[in-house]
Amino acid sequence: LRLGISVALVPSYLPMLGDVLEQFRQQYPGIPLETTLLSNDAVCAQLQNGTLDAGLVMDLGGCAAGLARTALTRHTAALLVPRCSPFWGRSSIAPAELDGRLLLVPGLAPEPLAPLWNTLRQAGARPKVEIGEQYYQVLYRTQERNGLALDRLEITSDHSMGNVQDVALDGMPPICAAFLQPEHAEHPCVRLLCSFLQEHLRNL
């Protein structure tokens, strides 16, 4: 059972994922679970070409063609804002305000973040979009370059000793950790893993 995990989800977004996968291995020792850390976009691509049996990605509800999606967690979509940003201390940010700003996102594929791309287009906003995959890389780049990064809303988070904070992004559906699998594949082990992750990650 080949599972691709987006680097955007670990270690901060799903901090318990490693422990949960180890529980799965212990509970089902007959299922050989192989995990690979990949970019958000690569997980989708390798599911589509048959390299992976299942994948975990960060998304806003969209799903690439030929894949079936199950949301494991749902949170209010937000932007990670550095202390030097004019958005610091705000309760929300409108998509139109992102015009010309550096915006870090987990991937550039059109489907997973489709609501974001559509909303930016409708608002006439053209941010400088770059891929920011790993959490600590994103933390550094938002502060070093006064950028913003797609995140989930965590009011009580102790992000880097208070140098960044989350501000809600208006007009977005929930940001999710999602389980993906090929649409027409009947793989009982994949269904079992999906159910197991739903059960153990639902309170995150």
Where are these regions (language model features)?
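Beta-alpha-beta core module
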Residues: 64-70, 74-75, 136-188, 192
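Flexible hinge/capping segments at coil-to-helix
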Residues: 67-77, 81-103, 187-191
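N-terminal winged-helix
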Residues: 1-28, 32-34, 44
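Secondary-structure junction motif
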Residues: 13-17, 101-123
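Short helices/loops that flank or line small-molecule/ion binding pockets
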Residues: 36-52, 135-146
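Short amphipathic alpha-helical coupling segments at ligand-binding clamshell hinges
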Residues: 16, 115-116, 185-197
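Short beta-strand-to-loop elements that line the ligand-binding cleft
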Residues: 31-39, 58, 106, 124-136
